[in-house]
Amino acid sequence: MARVSGAAAAEAALMRALYDEHAAVLWRYALRLTGDAAQAEDVVQETLLRAWQHPEVIGDTARPARAWLFTVARNMIIDERRSARFRNVVGSTDQSGTPEQSTPDEVNAALDRLLIADALAQLSAEHRAVIQRSYYRGWSTAQIATDLGIAEGTVKSRLHYAVRALRLTLQELGVTR
């Protein structure tokens, strides 16, 4: 009997550590995607419940638990947005009063924009400036260099490191594509 309670205590300690380490950042992520604090809390609780149901993921040292948690949370939010219940509650209506339905691609695109905006906000001001000018405005390296008053080589270097930092940030948020 002591063996079971010891295993249960170890499992409870593992879940507490998982909660302490990831719940706050997971909640902020879910809040950013949902725009609703209560729904974000529900997403966090359900995500941590799924983590508890899959202890092999938490114990896997090759793959960080945070990436798995963010992926689960994101998928739950996508599933909720795609559901008929969400479309009937939140969706707008056309002239006949029939709810307009978002396509899965529209939902994914909106969530991707939120994720990228969140990741961009975490970059340094210098990296964000070159990313915005290059990828969002379509400026050349020379135009960026002139606008920022830096050498073209510096622009290229900052772009390289900015894209690398953006990729790492998105991976931490659970983006795998």
UniProtKB/Swiss-Prot annotation:
Record note on disruption phenotype: In a single sigL or double sigL-rslA disruption mutant, no visible phenotype; not more susceptible than the parental strain to several oxidative and nitrosative stresses. Infected BALB/c or DBA/2 mice showed a significantly prolonged survival time relative to mice infected with wild-type bacteria, although bacteria proliferate normally.
- Induction profile: Expressed during growth in culture; expression increases from lag to exponential phase. Has a weak SigL-independent promoter, is also weakly autoregulated, no other sigma factor allows its transcription. Forms an operon with rslA.
InterPro entries on file:
RNA_pol_sigma-70-like, RNA_pol_sigma-70_dom, RNA_pol_sigma70_ECF_CS, RNA_pol_sigma70_r2, RNA_pol_sigma70_r4, RNA_pol_sigma_r2, RNA_pol_sigma_r3/r4-like, WH-like_DNA-bd_sf
**Entry keyword set:** DNA-binding, Sigma factor, Transcription, Transcription regulation, Virulence
Q: Which residues bind DNA?
A: 141-160
Q: Which parts of the sequence form the motif Interaction with polymerase core subunit RpoC? A: 42-45
Q: Where is this region: Sigma-70 factor domain-2?
A: 18-85
User: What's an example of a GO molecular-function annotation for this chain?
Assistant: DNA binding
Region Sigma-70 factor domain-4, residue ranges: 119-167
Annotated GO biological processes are:
DNA-templated transcription initiation; regulation of DNA-templated transcription
Tell me which NCBIfam families the record gives.
PRK09645.1, sigma70-ECF
Subunit note:
Interacts transiently with the RNA polymerase catalytic core formed by RpoA, RpoB, RpoC and RpoZ (2 alpha, 1 beta, 1 beta' and 1 omega subunit) to form the RNA polymerase holoenzyme that can initiate transcription. Interacts (via sigma-70 factor domain-4) with anti-sigma-L factor RslA.
Extra info from the record?
Extracytoplasmic function (ECF) sigma factors are held in an inactive form by an anti-sigma factor until released by regulated intramembrane proteolysis (RIP). RIP occurs when an extracytoplasmic signal triggers a concerted proteolytic cascade to transmit information and elicit cellular responses. The membrane-spanning anti-sigma factor is first cut extracytoplasmically (site-1 protease, S1P), then within the membrane itself (site-2 protease, S2P, Rip1), while cytoplasmic proteases finish degrading the regulatory protein, liberating SigL.
Q: Which family does it belong to?
A: Belongs to the sigma-70 factor family. ECF subfamily.
Domain comment as written in the entry: The sigma-70 factor domain-2 mediates sequence-specific interaction with the -10 element in promoter DNA, and plays an important role in melting the double-stranded DNA and the formation of the transcription bubble. The sigma-70 factor domain-2 mediates interaction with the RNA polymerase subunits RpoB and RpoC.
Q: Tell me, in a sentence or two, what this protein's role is.
A: Sigma factors are initiation factors that promote the attachment of RNA polymerase to specific initiation sites and are then released. Extracytoplasmic function (ECF) sigma factors are held in an inactive form by an anti-sigma factor until released by regulated intramembrane proteolysis. Over-expression of SigL induces 19-28 genes including polyketide synthases, secreted and membrane proteins. Might play a minor role in regulating SigB.
Q: How is this protein named in the record?
A: ECF RNA polymerase sigma factor SigL
The species is Mycobacterium tuberculosis (strain ATCC 25618 / H37Rv)
